[in-house]
Protein backbone atom coordinates (compact mmCIF):
# COMPACT_ATOMS: atom_id res chain seq x y z
CA UNK A 1 0.00 0.00 0.00
CA UNK A 2 1.28 3.46 -0.93
CA UNK A 3 0.14 6.33 1.26
CA UNK A 4 0.69 10.06 1.57
CA UNK A 5 0.45 12.14 4.72
CA UNK A 6 -0.17 15.88 4.64
CA UNK A 7 0.82 17.88 7.69
CA UNK A 8 3.51 15.28 8.34
CA UNK A 9 5.75 17.60 10.37
CA UNK A 10 3.00 18.67 12.75
CA UNK A 11 2.12 17.40 16.22
CA UNK A 12 -0.05 14.55 14.95
CA UNK A 13 1.81 14.01 11.70
CA UNK A 14 5.20 13.27 13.25
CA UNK A 15 3.69 10.69 15.59
CA UNK A 16 1.77 9.07 12.74
CA UNK A 17 4.89 8.86 10.56
CA UNK A 18 6.88 7.18 13.32
CA UNK A 19 4.17 4.62 13.96
CA UNK A 20 3.66 3.81 10.30
CA UNK A 21 7.36 3.14 9.88
CA UNK A 22 7.59 1.11 13.09
CA UNK A 23 4.56 -1.13 12.57
CA UNK A 24 3.66 -1.33 8.90
CA UNK A 25 5.74 -2.22 5.86
CA UNK A 26 4.12 -0.09 3.19
CA UNK A 27 5.70 -0.01 -0.24
CA UNK A 28 6.04 3.78 -0.11
CA UNK A 29 5.15 6.48 2.38
CA UNK A 30 5.16 10.05 1.08
CA UNK A 31 5.07 13.09 3.35
CA UNK A 32 3.93 16.43 1.94
CA UNK A 33 5.83 19.20 3.72
CA UNK A 34 6.38 22.91 3.24
CA UNK A 35 9.86 24.30 2.44
CA UNK A 36 10.23 25.89 5.88
CA UNK A 37 9.74 22.44 7.44
CA UNK A 38 12.10 20.62 5.09
CA UNK A 39 14.79 20.33 7.77
CA UNK A 40 12.43 18.47 10.12
CA UNK A 41 13.68 14.93 10.38
CA UNK A 42 11.26 12.28 9.18
CA UNK A 43 11.82 8.59 9.87
CA UNK A 44 13.23 6.60 6.99
CA UNK A 45 12.10 5.44 4.49
CA UNK A 46 9.49 8.22 4.27
CA UNK A 47 9.87 10.23 1.08
CA UNK A 48 9.32 14.00 1.46
CA UNK A 49 7.36 15.91 -1.17
CA UNK A 50 8.09 19.64 -0.89
CA UNK A 51 5.03 21.79 -1.59
CA UNK A 52 4.30 25.49 -1.20
CA UNK A 53 0.58 24.87 -0.85
CA UNK A 54 -1.98 22.09 -1.01
CA UNK A 55 -2.75 23.23 -4.55
CA UNK A 56 0.76 22.13 -5.56
CA UNK A 57 -0.05 18.67 -4.27
CA UNK A 58 -3.44 18.58 -5.99
CA UNK A 59 -1.73 19.35 -9.30
CA UNK A 60 1.00 16.72 -8.85
CA UNK A 61 -0.69 13.86 -10.68
CA UNK A 62 2.59 11.95 -10.90
CA UNK A 63 2.63 11.49 -7.11
CA UNK A 64 -1.13 11.15 -6.61
CA UNK A 65 -1.39 8.41 -9.22
CA UNK A 66 0.94 6.22 -7.15
CA UNK A 67 -1.21 6.37 -4.01
CA UNK A 68 -3.72 4.03 -2.46
CA UNK A 69 -4.59 6.31 0.46
CA UNK A 70 -4.14 9.90 1.63
CA UNK A 71 -4.22 10.82 5.32
CA UNK A 72 -5.00 14.53 5.33
CA UNK A 73 -3.83 16.25 8.50
CA UNK A 74 -2.74 19.63 7.13
CA UNK A 75 -5.00 22.47 8.22
CA UNK A 76 -5.16 26.07 9.29
CA UNK A 77 -5.51 25.49 13.01
CA UNK A 78 -7.64 27.22 15.61
CA UNK A 79 -5.97 30.41 16.86
CA UNK A 80 -6.75 32.20 20.11
CA UNK A 81 -5.70 35.66 18.85
CA UNK A 82 -6.53 35.65 15.17
CA UNK A 83 -5.85 39.07 13.61
CA UNK A 84 -6.86 38.03 10.08
CA UNK A 85 -9.42 40.54 8.68
CA UNK A 86 -11.73 37.70 7.60
CA UNK A 87 -10.91 34.58 9.67
CA UNK A 88 -13.69 32.48 8.14
CA UNK A 89 -12.41 33.12 4.61
CA UNK A 90 -8.87 32.25 5.70
CA UNK A 91 -10.01 28.99 7.31
CA UNK A 92 -12.20 28.08 4.33
CA UNK A 93 -9.38 28.62 1.83
CA UNK A 94 -7.22 25.91 3.40
CA UNK A 95 -9.53 23.69 5.43
CA UNK A 96 -12.44 23.56 3.00
CA UNK A 97 -11.52 24.55 -0.54
CA UNK A 98 -7.98 23.14 -0.67
CA UNK A 99 -9.10 19.94 1.07
CA UNK A 100 -11.88 19.38 -1.46
CA UNK A 101 -9.52 20.11 -4.36
CA UNK A 102 -7.05 17.52 -3.07
CA UNK A 103 -9.75 14.89 -2.62
CA UNK A 104 -11.17 15.55 -6.10
CA UNK A 105 -7.72 15.33 -7.68
CA UNK A 106 -7.01 12.12 -5.78
CA UNK A 107 -10.27 10.55 -6.89
CA UNK A 108 -9.62 11.41 -10.53
CA UNK A 109 -6.35 9.44 -10.60
CA UNK A 110 -7.69 6.43 -8.72
CA UNK A 111 -6.70 6.97 -5.09
CA UNK A 112 -8.87 4.54 -3.14
CA UNK A 113 -9.21 6.03 0.35
CA UNK A 114 -9.05 9.52 1.87
CA UNK A 115 -8.78 9.80 5.66
CA UNK A 116 -9.63 13.28 6.93
CA UNK A 117 -8.71 14.54 10.39
CA UNK A 118 -11.61 16.83 11.23
CA UNK A 119 -12.51 18.17 14.69
CA UNK A 120 -15.13 17.72 17.39
CA UNK A 121 -15.74 21.44 16.91
CA UNK A 122 -17.95 20.35 14.01
CA UNK A 123 -20.40 19.12 16.65
CA UNK A 124 -20.11 22.18 18.89
CA UNK A 125 -18.29 23.56 21.90
CA UNK A 126 -19.90 21.87 24.89
CA UNK A 127 -22.31 19.13 25.90
CA UNK A 128 -25.04 18.76 28.49
CA UNK A 129 -24.89 16.13 31.24
CA UNK A 130 -25.70 12.69 29.85
CA UNK A 131 -25.79 13.95 26.26
CA UNK A 132 -22.39 13.28 24.67
CA UNK A 133 -21.74 14.22 21.08
CA UNK A 134 -22.31 11.54 18.45
CA UNK A 135 -21.45 11.33 14.77
CA UNK A 136 -25.18 11.47 13.97
CA UNK A 137 -25.73 14.85 15.63
CA UNK A 138 -26.62 17.81 13.45
CA UNK A 139 -23.38 19.81 13.13
CA UNK A 140 -23.36 22.98 15.19
CA UNK A 141 -19.92 24.60 14.82
CA UNK A 142 -19.46 27.84 16.73
CA UNK A 143 -16.31 29.40 15.27
CA UNK A 144 -14.65 29.85 11.85
CA UNK A 145 -12.37 26.85 12.37
CA UNK A 146 -15.27 24.54 13.19
CA UNK A 147 -17.35 25.90 10.32
CA UNK A 148 -14.54 25.32 7.83
CA UNK A 149 -14.11 21.73 9.04
CA UNK A 150 -17.85 21.05 8.85
CA UNK A 151 -18.02 22.41 5.31
CA UNK A 152 -15.03 20.29 4.31
CA UNK A 153 -16.79 17.18 5.58
CA UNK A 154 -19.83 17.98 3.45
CA UNK A 155 -17.75 18.46 0.32
CA UNK A 156 -15.71 15.31 0.96
CA UNK A 157 -18.87 13.22 1.28
CA UNK A 158 -20.19 14.69 -1.96
CA UNK A 159 -16.94 13.86 -3.74
CA UNK A 160 -17.10 10.34 -2.35
CA UNK A 161 -20.66 9.90 -3.57
CA UNK A 162 -19.77 11.14 -7.07
CA UNK A 163 -16.48 9.34 -7.57
CA UNK A 164 -16.42 6.30 -5.31
CA UNK A 165 -13.53 7.69 -3.24
CA UNK A 166 -13.68 6.03 0.19
CA UNK A 167 -13.90 8.93 2.63
CA UNK A 168 -13.16 8.37 6.32
CA UNK A 169 -13.70 11.27 8.72
CA UNK A 170 -12.28 11.34 12.25
CA UNK A 171 -13.34 13.99 14.76
CA UNK A 172 -11.03 14.18 17.79
CA UNK A 173 -11.56 16.30 20.90
CA UNK A 174 -8.53 17.89 22.59
CA UNK A 175 -5.40 15.91 21.63
CA UNK A 176 -2.52 15.58 24.09
CA UNK A 177 0.78 13.77 24.06
CA UNK A 178 4.52 14.39 23.63
CA UNK A 179 5.03 17.77 22.00
CA UNK A 180 1.60 19.17 22.93
CA UNK A 181 1.37 22.96 22.93
CA UNK A 182 -1.26 25.65 23.57
CA UNK A 183 -3.68 25.37 26.49
CA UNK A 184 -2.68 21.87 27.55
CA UNK A 185 0.97 22.87 27.74
CA UNK A 186 0.00 25.93 29.78
CA UNK A 187 -1.89 23.74 32.27
CA UNK A 188 1.13 21.46 32.61
CA UNK A 189 3.37 24.48 33.20
CA UNK A 190 1.10 25.76 35.98
CA UNK A 191 0.98 22.36 37.65
CA UNK A 192 4.73 21.84 37.27
CA UNK A 193 5.41 25.17 38.98
CA UNK A 194 3.24 24.17 41.91
CA UNK A 195 0.96 27.16 41.49
CA UNK A 196 -2.28 27.17 43.49
CA UNK A 197 -5.10 26.94 40.99
CA UNK A 198 -8.69 28.02 41.76
CA UNK A 199 -10.10 25.06 39.81
CA UNK A 200 -10.94 22.55 42.52
CA UNK A 201 -14.74 22.84 42.41
CA UNK A 202 -15.48 22.31 38.72
CA UNK A 203 -17.91 19.38 38.24
CA UNK A 204 -17.57 19.10 34.46
CA UNK A 205 -16.69 16.08 32.29
CA UNK A 206 -14.40 16.28 29.29
CA UNK A 207 -13.29 13.75 26.70
CA UNK A 208 -9.67 13.84 25.62
CA UNK A 209 -7.67 11.70 23.23
CA UNK A 210 -4.04 10.73 23.69
CA UNK A 211 -1.88 11.07 20.61
CA UNK A 212 -1.04 7.33 20.47
CA UNK A 213 -4.74 6.46 20.61
CA UNK A 214 -5.60 8.83 17.78
CA UNK A 215 -2.72 7.50 15.69
CA UNK A 216 -3.84 3.93 16.35
CA UNK A 217 -7.35 4.72 15.11
CA UNK A 218 -6.06 6.38 11.95
CA UNK A 219 -3.89 3.37 11.17
CA UNK A 220 -6.86 1.08 11.81
CA UNK A 221 -8.88 3.11 9.30
CA UNK A 222 -6.23 2.68 6.60
CA UNK A 223 -7.28 -0.87 5.81
CA UNK A 224 -10.41 -1.69 7.81
CA UNK A 225 -13.22 -2.77 5.46
CA UNK A 226 -15.88 -1.12 7.64
CA UNK A 227 -14.19 2.30 7.74
CA UNK A 228 -15.12 3.78 4.33
CA UNK A 229 -17.76 6.49 4.16
CA UNK A 230 -18.03 6.76 7.94
CA UNK A 231 -17.50 9.46 10.55
CA UNK A 232 -15.77 8.35 13.73
CA UNK A 233 -15.55 10.12 17.07
CA UNK A 234 -12.53 9.22 19.15
CA UNK A 235 -11.41 9.61 22.77
CA UNK A 236 -9.53 7.77 25.51
CA UNK A 237 -12.93 6.44 26.66
CA UNK A 238 -12.25 7.85 30.13
CA UNK A 239 -13.72 11.30 30.69
CA UNK A 240 -12.28 13.58 33.37
CA UNK A 241 -13.33 16.69 35.22
CA UNK A 242 -10.91 19.62 35.15
CA UNK A 243 -9.78 18.86 38.76
CA UNK A 244 -9.26 15.19 37.85
CA UNK A 245 -7.23 16.18 34.81
CA UNK A 246 -5.00 18.45 36.88
CA UNK A 247 -4.49 15.76 39.52
CA UNK A 248 -3.56 13.27 36.81
CA UNK A 249 -1.05 15.77 35.43
CA UNK A 250 0.40 16.37 38.88
CA UNK A 251 0.91 12.65 39.50
CA UNK A 252 2.63 12.26 36.13
CA UNK A 253 4.90 15.22 36.85
CA UNK A 254 5.62 14.09 40.40
CA UNK A 255 4.22 17.33 41.80
CA UNK A 256 1.50 18.08 44.36
CA UNK A 257 -1.83 19.25 42.99
CA UNK A 258 -2.70 22.55 44.65
CA UNK A 259 -6.35 23.04 43.77
CA UNK A 260 -8.48 25.62 45.54
CA UNK A 261 -12.25 25.05 45.40
CA UNK A 262 -13.95 28.35 44.65
CA UNK A 263 -17.48 28.91 43.30
CA UNK A 264 -17.67 28.96 39.53
CA UNK A 265 -19.19 32.51 39.42
CA UNK A 266 -16.11 33.73 41.29
CA UNK A 267 -13.89 31.98 38.77
CA UNK A 268 -15.79 33.60 35.92
CA UNK A 269 -15.35 37.01 37.53
CA UNK A 270 -11.64 36.35 38.07
CA UNK A 271 -10.98 35.40 34.45
CA UNK A 272 -12.90 38.48 33.31
CA UNK A 273 -10.75 40.68 35.54
CA UNK A 274 -7.55 39.33 33.98
CA UNK A 275 -8.89 39.96 30.48
CA UNK A 276 -9.76 36.36 29.57
CA UNK A 277 -13.54 36.12 29.91
CA UNK A 278 -13.76 32.97 27.76
CA UNK A 279 -11.20 31.05 29.80
CA UNK A 280 -13.70 30.08 32.51
CA UNK A 281 -16.06 28.69 29.87
CA UNK A 282 -13.30 26.48 28.48
CA UNK A 283 -12.24 25.30 31.93
CA UNK A 284 -15.71 24.76 33.37
CA UNK A 285 -17.84 23.45 30.50
CA UNK A 286 -18.30 19.80 29.61
CA UNK A 287 -17.49 18.21 26.27
CA UNK A 288 -18.06 14.49 26.02
CA UNK A 289 -18.06 12.23 22.98
CA UNK A 290 -19.65 8.81 22.51
CA UNK A 291 -17.12 6.46 20.92
CA UNK A 292 -19.24 3.31 21.21
CA UNK A 293 -20.18 3.36 17.50
CA UNK A 294 -16.48 3.66 16.63
CA UNK A 295 -15.65 0.72 18.88
CA UNK A 296 -18.47 -1.45 17.58
CA UNK A 297 -17.95 -0.79 13.87
CA UNK A 298 -14.17 -1.18 13.89
CA UNK A 299 -13.71 -3.54 16.82
CA UNK A 300 -11.39 -0.87 18.16
CA UNK A 301 -10.51 0.17 21.68
CA UNK A 302 -8.01 2.82 22.81
CA UNK A 303 -4.76 0.90 23.42
CA UNK A 304 -3.18 3.42 25.83
CA UNK A 305 -4.67 4.42 29.20
CA UNK A 306 -4.91 8.03 30.32
CA UNK A 307 -2.38 7.46 33.10
CA UNK A 308 0.17 5.94 30.73
CA UNK A 309 -0.42 8.61 28.09
CA UNK A 310 -0.06 11.36 30.68
CA UNK A 311 3.17 9.78 31.91
CA UNK A 312 4.82 9.90 28.48
CA UNK A 313 3.48 13.44 27.97
CA UNK A 314 4.99 14.53 31.28
CA UNK A 315 8.32 12.88 30.44
CA UNK A 316 8.50 14.81 27.18
CA UNK A 317 7.46 18.03 28.96
CA UNK A 318 10.29 17.62 31.49
CA UNK A 319 12.78 16.75 28.76
CA UNK A 320 11.89 19.85 26.76
CA UNK A 321 11.95 22.03 29.88
CA UNK A 322 15.46 20.87 30.71
CA UNK A 323 16.73 21.11 27.15
CA UNK A 324 19.41 23.83 26.78
CA UNK A 325 18.17 26.81 24.81
CA UNK A 326 19.23 26.65 21.20
CA UNK A 327 19.79 22.92 21.12
CA UNK A 328 17.87 20.92 18.51
CA UNK A 329 14.58 19.38 19.52
CA UNK A 330 14.07 15.69 19.09
CA UNK A 331 10.82 13.82 19.46
CA UNK A 332 11.58 10.14 20.07
Predicted regions located by residue number:
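Conserved C-terminal active-site "lid" loop/helix of NAD(P)H-dependent oxidoreductases
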Residues: 211, 270-301
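Active-site Tyr-X1-5-Lys
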Residues: 140-168
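Substrate-positioning beta->alpha
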Residues: 180-186, 200-223, 229-233
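Conserved Rossmann-fold NAD(P)-dependent oxidoreductase catalytic core, especially the SDR/UDP-sugar
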Residues: 100-144
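Glycine-rich Rossmann NAD(P)(H)-binding loop
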Residues: 177, 199-204, 232-239, 250-254, ...
